[in-house]
Amino acid sequence: MSATQKDPRDIIIAPVVSEKSYGLIDQGKYTFIVDPRSNKTEIKLAIEKIFGVQVASVNTLNKQGKTRRTKFGMGKRKDTKRAIVSLKSGSIDIFTTVG
């Protein structure tokens, strides 16, 4: 592995568990929280390597962290990046294996 390649497990942080993401699974689209510094090509290669599926497209969105009032003044939650991954064929068994 060269110095420019990242480990796929460092790129894909976690699946998004929400009502909207469950609805997208029926369309063959899966939503993940990813490293904010990663690009669409890195996300595609990481998904293909981890889950062994063919990726058709990757859509990304950056979510700004909310500003919240705390006991010590104003604080800010961290910014996150999400990726919506469309598959050519097959499926990912992320949510069915949870006990």
UniProtKB/Swiss-Prot annotation:
An annotated GO BP: translation
Record's InterPro entries?
A: Nucleotide-bd_a/b_plait_sf, Ribosomal_uL23-like, Ribosomal_uL23/eL15/eS24_sf
GO cellular component terms, alphabetically, are: ribonucleoprotein complex; ribosome
Which keywords belong to this entry? Ribonucleoprotein, Ribosomal protein, RNA-binding, rRNA-binding
Q: Which Pfam families match?
A: Ribosomal_L23
Task: Give the top-rank taxon of the lineage listed in the UniProt record for this protein.
Answer: Bacteria
Molecular function as annotated in GO: rRNA binding; structural constituent of ribosome
Protein family according to the UniProt entry = Belongs to the universal ribosomal protein uL23 family.
Annotated function: One of the early assembly proteins it binds 23S rRNA. One of the proteins that surrounds the polypeptide exit tunnel on the outside of the ribosome. Forms the main docking site for trigger factor binding to the ribosome.
What PANTHER family does its record include?
60S RIBOSOMAL PROTEIN L23A (PTHR11620)
Q: How does it assemble?
A: Part of the 50S ribosomal subunit. Contacts protein L29, and trigger factor when it is bound to the ribosome.
The name of this protein is Large ribosomal subunit protein uL23
Q: Which organism is it from?
A: Clavibacter michiganensis subsp. michiganensis (strain NCPPB 382)
Gene responsible for this protein: rplW
